[in-house]
């Protein structure tokens, strides 16, 4: 008998919840809008989606989303569905069509959000997952313990390759561990990819010869498949140790193809995540979403940051990071490294460390480093000092007595 995939949803409906659950199950498996003689009991038993659980929560007077059936009461519930793996086989795109396809558009539904996903070993074992993960990333970055201290090239776009390389030079002078392109910086006319990689890697390789370790730079290779392969190969040939892709831009198939080709860690940027999560009555929670990208082979996954510049609450950020650090299942851990970013400074270090319970993470600060009044190297040292304090259980003020860079940073980290 085929193992099953289980997906859990928050659901709102103006109709009978049990009937709506059956409509969703039918739409996402063997059913259609009319009864068919060919949809036999045996076929439904073998291939149909099952309603595993339906827990009523509460009701509302108005619908969360427009365009559905009119009603004087809208019932909210937790719905769990399951499907046999044989319906779609070991395919991420076809899994996506099943668990997150037409069901969001059904007129019976006035709210639907995918909140959990359980994948059996018969599915997860078909995927290689991250090639490097936490241990491989630490080895390449030369950071055996503690957080990987990182940044984003700023301004995000508009610098030339030479100006970018100069920023990298200043960051390395501050002993940075990790540098990434902004998601907007790919292969524009002012900063062509090849010229940028060569200019930056000259600086990185020269510094590595002197420092004994090489800073990890995540170059944004996002593009068409052939472009991404060529860009990856250039980074590898120049001695680079990481490539970055924008996940929603290239999709699961794009990531899988790069995973098959790559000899470097894949840094996964979640640009566009807001349209999937921001409406609480529609879309995805991060926990099920990130599973698919880890299966596809992503080594680092952005999770936003505490007290960020966006709209996401701290509790959601923490849940996202914990999800990335959790094994997919007992047969396939597929661990990846959470990346904290967005309005980050050293002030978030202690709370981040306490919430996650470990330092297996990349903490990137753009303005929090580049805006330091004493310059970029001092900005790097200030962030590192903040993490020393966090891991030692000391206050920033106490650590600042030993770190002039941190002391001056406290005035502009607001």
Swiss-Prot record:
Annotated Gene3D superfamilies: Ribulose bisphosphate carboxylase, large subunit, C-terminal domain, RuBisCO large subunit, N-terminal domain
EC number assigned by the record: 3.7.1.28
UniProt cross-references to InterPro entries, sorted A to Z: RuBisCO (IPR033966), RuBisCO_lsu_C (IPR000685), RuBisCO_lsu_C_sf (IPR036376), RuBisCO_lsu_fd_N (IPR017443), RuBisCO_lsu_N_sf (IPR036422)
Keywords for this protein: Carbohydrate metabolism, Hydrolase, Magnesium, Metal-binding
GO terms (BP aspect): carbon fixation
UniProt modified residues of type N6-carboxylysine: 180
Pfam families: RuBisCO_large (PF00016), RuBisCO_large_N (PF02788)
Known cofactor(s): Mg(2+)
Catalytically driven reaction(s): 3-oxoisoapionate 4-phosphate + H2O = (2R)-3-phosphoglycerate + glycolate + H(+)
Binding site for Mg(2+): 180, 182-183
Gene Ontology molecular function: hydrolase activity; magnesium ion binding; ribulose-bisphosphate carboxylase activity
Pathway, per record: Carbohydrate metabolism
PANTHER family cross-referenced by the UniProt entry: RIBULOSE BISPHOSPHATE CARBOXYLASE, RIBULOSE BISPHOSPHATE CARBOXYLASE LARGE CHAIN
Function summary: Involved in catabolism of D-apiose. Catalyzes the conversion of 3-oxo-isoapionate 4-phosphate to 3-phosphoglycerate and glycolate.
Family the entry assigns: Belongs to the RuBisCO large chain family.
Protein name: 3-oxo-isoapionate-4-phosphate transcarboxylase/hydrolase
Organism listed in the record: Xanthobacter autotrophicus (strain ATCC BAA-1158 / Py2)
Gene: oiaT
């Amino acid at each position: 008998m085929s193992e099953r995939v289980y997906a859990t949803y928050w659901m709102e409906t103006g109709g009978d919840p049990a009937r709506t659950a059956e409509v969703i199950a039918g739409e996402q498996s063997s059913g259609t809008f009319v009864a068919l003689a060919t949809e036999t009991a045996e076929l439904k038993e073998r291939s149909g989606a099952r309603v595993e659980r339906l827990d009523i929560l509460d009701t509302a007077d108005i619908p969360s989303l427009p365009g559905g059936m009119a009603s004087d009461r809208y019932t909210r519930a937790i719905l769990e569905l399951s499907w046999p793996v044989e319906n779609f086989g070991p395919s991420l795109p076809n899994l996506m069509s099943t668990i997150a396809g037409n069901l969001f558009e059904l007129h019976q539904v006035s709210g639907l959000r995918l909140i959990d996903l359980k994948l059996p070993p018969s599915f997860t074992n078909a995927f290689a997952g991250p090639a490097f993960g936490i241990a491989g990333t630490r080895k390449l970055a030369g950071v055996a313990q503690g957080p990987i201290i990182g940044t984003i090239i700023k301004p995000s776009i508009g610098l030339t390759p030479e100006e970018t390389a100069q920023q990298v030079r200043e960051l390395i002078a501050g002993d940075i561990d990790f540098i990434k392109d902004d998601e907007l910086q790919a292969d524009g006319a002012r900063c062509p990819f090849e010229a940028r990689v060569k200019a930056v890697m000259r600086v990185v390789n020269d510094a590595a010869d002197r420092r004994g370790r090489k800073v990890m730079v995540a170059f944004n290779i996002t593009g068409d498949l052939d472009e991404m392969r060529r860009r990856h190969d250039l980074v590898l040939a120049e001695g680079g140790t990481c490539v970055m892709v924008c996940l929603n831009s290239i999709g699961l198939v794009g990531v899988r193809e790069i995973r098959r080709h790559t000899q470097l860690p894949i840094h996964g940027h979640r640009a566009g995540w807001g349209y999937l999560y921001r409406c609480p009555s529609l879309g995805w929670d991060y926990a099920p979403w990130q599973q698919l990208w880890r299966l596809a082979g992503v080594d680092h996954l952005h999770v936003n940051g505490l007290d960020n510049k966006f709209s996401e609450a701290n509790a959601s950020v923490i849940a996202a990071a914990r999800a990335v650090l959790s094994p997919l299942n007992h047969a396939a851990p597929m661990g990846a490294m959470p990346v904290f970013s967005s309005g980050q400074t050293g002030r978030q270090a202690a709370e981040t460390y306490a919430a996650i319970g470990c330092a297996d993470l990349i903490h990137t600060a753009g303005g929090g480093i580049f805006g330091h009044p004493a310059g970029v190297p001092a900005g790097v040292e200030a962030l590192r000092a903040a993490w020393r304090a966090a891991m030692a259980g000391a206050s920033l003020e106490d650590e600042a007595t030993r770190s002039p860079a941190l002391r001056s940073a406290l005035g502009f980290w607001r």
